[in-house]
């Protein structure tokens, strides 16, 4: 279509294929010339592309006629998995609201959990851990939404503050499957205009089986930039605007006509109603919300024209939109089909022009699900709900998705361009369509504006949109599907008793049984036939006859025959006559989408195959894999360039959607970027890459291209091949239509188009256990537009005659059968040599394997090899008289495939299926010279499970006219008539010697209800073997008394063909019976191949005694203590390792220590003076490492300094722990990726540059003045993120541990076979070619024994230190646990039940235990964490196991970690029984090194000289003391730099071990911080154990005096006067201690906001200075039996309130201060400013723990506005001081405060009503009152005067004077 000329397939065709129909080929060329642009005829472009030759080690046939060979015959089905979602809610900040009581709820699916309620704060601190367990298929589980909401808690109806949503898939796709220390942005779903509602700091992790959780350090509690650390994936913008997601549903077609209601079916039966029995509606789900359309009654082709509108922040944290079509039922609705659209595939997150918003369609979505039968009960309903692969087409739906950014802020501009493009109608559609679309858009815009005015919530809206009844009749094109069945074999006997036929369908076309109406063209089969054009044009100018094509989508039913040699399989005799199917379907012409996908997929396939080829080159150690890799990348660049040049032309397509254009641009831009990278790799621009790195980069390219291949907008539905038994569907294969699509341009053609592809049919739905193949079908399929129909037969194997369905049809129809008249006789030789790594099918953990080899209609079986997982058959199976039809050259290029199935033979019952593989035979024709083929491994698969490898090769030999005598001769058979594999095919063997180290067996479980007591190990390889001695009593000593043995065996010279080595352990029982206990098979021996070691001679030449004497002399001369080298030798440390030699002055070497990286970012200031190679210089200014005598004094000095610095905090082991934690955290911050390979520091350089936890002031001084002798440095230890074994290769440097398996292997436990492990074998192997002359063999001692300690019992003192645990799984219903420790070692069990820690998931144990043990009997240490229960048995939370023996004997010296500094006493006292000089002397002796020689200022080992300070000055006496311990310790830390024998020695450390529970295998149940020390009893006794008991929190009392308030806002208004006032009082408490809230008295009627209080609050609390946290111990609720302890930052809350008499008090403002870090107070009320307070920098903040006493003004705020100021004084005293100098609360004794001098207006109305009248009325209005009073008297006088005047006058007149 686009004319990209990647002539891969064409070139091959031209190289030597004989075409059946040359005219068709010519006409195809003509068609191509007519249709394509002139550039398409450029021939040379094809040369850019290399041949698609098969590059796998399996010899496969040429891919010209057949599709690429796939050895995996079945895809695995979707399996349920266990997942654990762990969420830690740390704290919230900036929550919106006033005086809120926030509580956090977490909802995942139907599960809901809730945190505790925090009172009266907008910044609550929780630090609570929640765990959710889910089981289900990954793909569906990852759509679950985690919804975290923060509510304001009320007794009735909590109020939502804000919420946050993210789906599990987004979390799982993060590095380490987790978000760590991130801030979730909270928004109000009810009103999206209100913006941010606060931030919630949390960790979210999603862990599957076997996933390892990477721990991240908790960041400090200081003010961190929240906006820069939001909980969003990398690459997302920090500000996410709101957006509307429109999902427009136009119509659906071809839905299954089914109604789930019984009455509907009854009605149909009686009335004969032919209406569509389906009432469809669509449900769209996104981001945890769901909207549904209206129901269209009785309609299989419904039209909705409705849009579902979601509102979500963009980009969303939920990946998929779920579209589900339902059938409404009277009882319940039934899902018809489900489809998911991944937003990542319809958008691009990149910035700039490259990025585009999610956009989709309008495009059809093809729906798949269960078979379209109209049965009432659907057995496969799960498929319709999206579980598993759909087995049938269930209609299609026309959908459009668009996104509109709502925010009017700056973000809109970023997306506006894309949005406009999205809104524009497609110009490629005709004008009618454009108008309709435009109208729809306008209407939609109008509606959406209306809607936004109506509601701003995130509620889903569903509304109709106006479009013409028909959007635009998309231009349908007719496609022809043609298929020819070449082989149908391996048909299961159960379904082979009825006639078998095959049906091929695409959509509902071709589906004759239950297809329903044909959608698309809406034509009946008859009318469709009439319109068809002649397809196959005569090439010789004959007139083409326009005869319609009948539809033939099903082969003729035929009764199958029984396969020769295997009654379980039947076959259909398609020998000379190959049945064909063909039919026409009608679909929208958007095949350009599939063409682009095919081009990209071919690029990805080619690159992947090339990478595999390079890997093979590396395996067989051939030269120049680098050059090959560069060639591969060059080819990739040329292919990409060809694609880009075509894509940049942006060819005009009909029916192109916005997404089509955007995707095409994205594809070429991505390829352009990849090309640039590939060029950089070829030219090695940035840095020189190794081959492995180049392969890794190329693999990334493949993954990127594969992502682009997947086309979200469907076009032609998938093709289904169904096998019908008596018209009943029994098995199917599903093929993507793009793989079959034809294009005149070779590069755009589907990879299986016009090729014979082998399909293994599978039954629909869940597969039964032990299922095998249903049928093997070889079918040729071709799908393409009718205009290309002349090419349907082009690639068929030549030599056929086309047989038409009816004689009158002419020759222009597709044939109904292909007749291959030519036949040839072949012989197949199956050379079955051996297999390895098979699945265990018997209860004893072994199998009795045999193989069935099936070829065409023949099957043969190998002999059974009993009781093995690595059988060697060495058998040749001969298949004679095989008749193959067709051209002989075609058969040579594309032979039929051989299927090998492996079974386990059982005495009772049928054989058990172990797996299968597919191979292509090597063909040799009669006229070719014979060359013996090479054996190679074929991978075996049992379903999705890897089932081992088969070493075999298959030859297909053409029988010449002279008969079988003309074939290469075979070796004569043995007595049982079994032919061996010919000698010229068998591998070339050499004599090897296998040395075996037998150490012992461990952890043996019961076998057949009896304990193992007398085990023996049997080693077997290549038919030879050796037995160990029998252990006489496993209980007393599980080690073998004879340590080593050897045997000789003939092994292939090619290392890749080496047979497996099997380890079997048997138990000898009474009466000479033996029982197999367990087995282990080593499939790859390469790890045990030993090269002949030349360096052995020099090592033995070294005089082993001389260095010892020298050392001892020099020691006596220089060291007063006399560290003698001849001290007791524990049996350890005897192994050599090659390490690069360091520079002469080793100590400052920059070589890194990967595992030590966490603690070693800086070089040590203390060691810097020692680095100079000065021998006898006087001591420098630097702080000396004190020798033993003065160390007590130095410890005192340390104590003093620390006490001055950190609130009388005594230096102890925890000081070292917190310093190490801080160091580790800083190292991770500097190196966030945590690259272990970082090489900037050494353990000896880090040992001292450490700050103490609580203080920062001195840290800076340490950095600035590293040599300041006034400041001591804390020693630190190494804190490992994982267990110690993972850092030191499991301590398997001297012996390896092999797990012995027993019992059947199942797919469920693959990879985590914990239940099958019956015990462990400890030993090792050394394999090397046998020396030619026997004299050169080692005399006496075997090579493998050199350096191995004796394995007699050793008594050891073991100290186990348990520091803390974190993230334990909750064991109680309330989501907490009461953990305690149980330790088991042999028969010793220590239960620490009394010391359980109540209600805690992150307990600090600080416990140490001492056990005496005897190795090897008691060598497995188990540490279990139990949950303490008052009633019932205690529950196990998790356990971890440590093999102490491996550590004890390891050359890494894991018995006691080397400390960073040498000291005699104090917190860092030397723990080991041997001093550093003694350890060094012993290491040199064991490794036969010359030395150590001690000289002043240096130590010499061989030719290495280590310089450093050895003379120290005693401060008190000014005496000089000589000590070599410090320098010796430094040498030990650099031991890995010693040439040949050096290795890393274990430093003082804490390991973090994961805890597991047997009921949840592979799922972490928490982590444990601990370490183990071991001391042999034959050495001097060690000192007392380290005291790691937890620090007790220190008691403090905070005295807060509230003096005055100013400018408090006035809330009340006088009803008479309108004057504002407030009745002010202040409330205060420490966060977490809300029960101890304290209030001042009320300052009534404050008219200015001023309040006078003179009121004292007293807050006693417990505090840990090192952790800067307050410890709160309280009962969780009234029903709790025990108090729980929690740690929280010490935060003081002060609030100002307005007192109300009749209603609840009014909240006016709050002030929260972290007592560790709060802004300085203002000196006056005027200077007190809210902005200054909130924006105070860390440097200006102060700590009450340093200042002790602070007084000043601080601001109150409400909704981020200043609402008042308070003058307060804070005074911090310790509990002891508070007891000595107590003060009274409020204004009470002792030390009472004076009453405040309040204004006269301050009083209560109720208490003093007259005062109230006086002050509020009389004082303000007295003149008005007086005037009013006078006026009233005057008025009364006047009234009385007027009233009495007439009477008086009349009386006067009458009476007279």
Swiss-Prot record:
Ca(2+) 2 binds at residues 1372, 1378, 1427, 1429. Residues 37-53, 426-447, 1178-1189, 1226-1245 have a biased composition (Basic and acidic residues). Residues 65-181, 225-356, 810-937, 969-1099, 1338-1457, 1578-1729 form the C2 domain. It is a single-pass membrane protein. CDD domains: C2B_Ferlin, C2C_Ferlin, C2D_Ferlin, C2E_Ferlin, C2F_Ferlin. Residues 1-1824 are cytoplasmic. Its main location: membrane. Disulfide bonds: none annotated. It holds the Pfam family Ferlin_C. It is found in: Membrane. GO terms for molecular function: metal ion binding. Keywords: Calcium, Membrane, Metal-binding, Repeat, Transmembrane, Transmembrane helix. Ca(2+) 3 binds at residues 1372, 1427, 1429, 1435. Signal peptide: none annotated. The keyword Cell division does not apply. Belongs to the ferlin family. This is Fer-1-like protein 6. It comes from Homo sapiens (Human). The gene is FER1L6.
